[in-house]
């Protein structure tokens, strides 16, 4: 049956199809490599990669190869698998906690101000009530009115009033005479002194003033003109230089990015992944993040097992980005992860030393600084038996 002509034709056509698909795939991979090489998208080394949405859904990326150009803000990731997690992304959690804390603080401040306003209103109402309903105040007002209306009827009171008025008149006349004499003498002395001083000063000022004023006015005018012209010129030059530098950087970045995107769009079809708004990588012990990342999937024809991702955005330090969101954020989780990583490195180094035949150490030497051992319980017991 296999020797029949129709079966041979079918078998050959299948082989040709497989061969054609493999050729097309290798051609597409070669074109992608050529585009990356042309635009200086070089190899990058990251420990892990993950993506997240604004809602906090996390997708972990098992990457086989990463390439990028930080100047263009472009990263190409070859991923063997992408799987999602139920955990909420820590950046989203920090932002939500900050918003909730701010709302709580605003509510507390609003309640405090509300209570203070109510307290002030009550105090004002009490003050108004006391002012309007004070019986002692009314009694005092009535007594004062009665005293103003009462007329003096006794002769003894009239005589005492006349004596008091005579004494007061004599005292006032004596005081006024003395004060008028003192004032007239002071005025005359002041006038004569002022006239003599004015005459003497006018003559000296007219001679020396003309010369000094001309010199000072010329100097001050020249200095003010120089300062006023130099300061705005320097400031304008600084501003123009900064603006030009920023424009050049933006133009260069846009130029490199435009050329890369033009090339890759002409050779591949790109599929947008709108759910991936954050892209995070770990380089050694440093976490880096792209905020508002734009992630495309490079569609390969025929489809491959690997997924090629194109990530667009500027990398920045995750710690500084989190401090921008919440200045009070404490990097406890990051510090914990870094210490665990350093402990693992120390353990690996200790194991390498133990495995070498020349350096045979005692079990006490294989204990780390924090008290944990780098060996398992079985290995530890074996070393004790050998010793």
From Swiss-Prot:
It comes from the Viruses. Residues 204-213 have a biased composition (Basic and acidic residues). Residues 98-129 form a coiled coil. Residues 1-23, 146-255 are annotated as: Disordered. The keyword Protease does not apply. Keywords: Coiled coil. Transmembrane segments: none annotated. Residues 162-175, 182-194 have a biased composition (Low complexity). The keyword Coiled coil applies. Residues 214-231 have a biased composition (Polar residues). This is Uncharacterized protein R604.
